[in-house]
Amino acid sequence: MVELGIKGYQEEIVTPELLACHIGSGTVRVFATPLMITLMERTCRLSVQPYLDEGFETVGTHVNVSHVSATPEGMKVWCDSELIGIDGRRLTFKVVAQDSHGIIGEGTHERFIVNVARFQAKTDTKLE
């Protein structure tokens, strides 16, 4: 059962594939904002997945974060998340990303609990 206060943690090393200049979000050799957001989403998703029934997953629906400090290639970055709101199937998380010099990004992220088979079937109707 999903409850308020569930915490998550994920970390990674900023490799060349995670740089803004590599993914096209900029020309500088720094941790790309879209991939910081990916780290935040993954941290939230993995934190609650063990509490969901089989066949259920969460999908990201809203991101409200600031990327406040650049991180160069080779540094470790990590994200902490905390589930701070539950409204039916909507989950709201506080997210904070850091490197060894401090906070690099923070904000909130919302996810919805979905039945995977039903969600995929509904989405696939767009192909018809």
Where are these regions (language model features)?
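Intrinsic-disorder/low-complexity, polar/charged segments enriched in Ser/Thr/Lys/Arg/Asp/Glu/Gln
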Residues: E3-Y9, H62, K76-W78, R90-T92, ...
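Residue-level structural signal for beta-strand termini and adjacent loop
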Residues: V96, H109-E110
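Catalytic strand-loop segment that frames the active site of acyl-thioester-processing enzymes
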Residues: M1-A32
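Hydrophobic beta-strand-centered segment that forms part of the acyl-chain substrate-binding groove
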Residues: L46-W78
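Short beta-strand edge segments in extracellular beta-sheet folds
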Residues: I13-T15, E110-V114
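Hydrophobic beta-sheet segments that form the core/acyl-binding groove
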Residues: V65-S100
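C-terminal output/interaction extensions
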Residues: G105, F112-E128
